[in-house]
Amino acid sequence: METWQEVAVHVHRDAQEAVSHVLIETGSQGVAIADSADYIGQKDRFGELYPDVEQSDMIAITAYYPSSTNLADVIATINEQLAELASFGLQVGQVTVDSQELAEEDWADNWKKYYEPARITHDLTIVPSWTDYDASAGEKVIKLDPGMAFGTGTHPTTKMSLFALEQVLRGGETVIDVGTGSGVLSIASSLLGAKTIYAYDLDDVAVRVAQENIDLNQGTDNIHVAAGDLLKGVSQEADVIVANILADILVLLTDDAYRLVKKEGYLILSGIISEKLDMVLEAAFSAGFFLETHMVQGEWNALVFKKTDDISGVIGG
């Protein structure tokens, strides 16, 4: 019987997506994320509130490696990468790393216990792919397989991106999703009525995972996934461009975004920690955008900019 090695990394919630990516890059075959915020005030599939859930800023990200993996080398690499993330200003908290060995059948089912359907916005609910879920009238369901990396749609940066998409999409738009990760924002855009979505990611794993998640959802053949370095080489104009990535990378795409966003179109930027907010604002303003909406959850910020000559309805207009 094949065995697997489990590594649990305990970090601050703000580092969820970055650390998940690190674990996949070190060879993990999947990750599971245990976050108390996903359970407080939520009901399980039987309609019962989760009992005795204590709020914490720390989460556990569990990764699974084949038995042939040299775990000592992996853990050393993880610690190096986490230290580098902290040096970039990302809050990782007091990191601890644990490991154990699992049988094949334990690995196959162990991580699924962490995930339940989650209502993210007024219209959008994210549902694990293996769960039978009866949607209510008007509810739009995004099916995701969170067995791979890039989060499950419950991180504050993703939630705010989804809120922003609900705010700006009215139907028939062209959307560009930069750094698509799991593909959740592209799937949401399709469900919210966008006509065509182009999803780009520099990471080949993300491109594959996004396509797999898109294939789980009906009516999403209007999403086109491809490898791409931000907006370099992209000529397709869009009504909406959305990017949920680190602030240091967001500032690199604002000029290209202004070139591609149609007049009266929108640029949605998320993944911005508060200490880097001014840097992102300055880059977007310099490119020519006007700020329409600023959302905040904890230390995270999301911004909705508009490309317009009519500044009467925008912040600072």
Swiss-Prot record:
Q: A Pfam family matched by this chain, by name?
A: PrmA
Task: Please give one Gene Ontology molecular function term for this protein.
Answer: protein-lysine N-methyltransferase activity
Got a GO cellular component term for this one?
cytoplasm
Where does the record place it? Cytoplasm
CDD domains the record matches = AdoMet_MTases (cd02440)
Q: Which Gene3D superfamilies match?
A: Vaccinia Virus protein VP39 (3.40.50.150)
Q: Which UniProt keywords apply?
A: Cytoplasm, Methyltransferase, S-adenosyl-L-methionine, Transferase
List residues traversing the bilayer.
none
Cited function: Methylates ribosomal protein L11.
Among HAMAP family, the record links this protein to:
Methyltr_PrmA
Q: What does the sequence similarity comment in the record state about its family?
A: Belongs to the methyltransferase superfamily. PrmA family.
Name by which UniProt lists this protein: Ribosomal protein L11 methyltransferase
* Source species of the chain: Streptococcus pyogenes serotype M49 (strain NZ131)
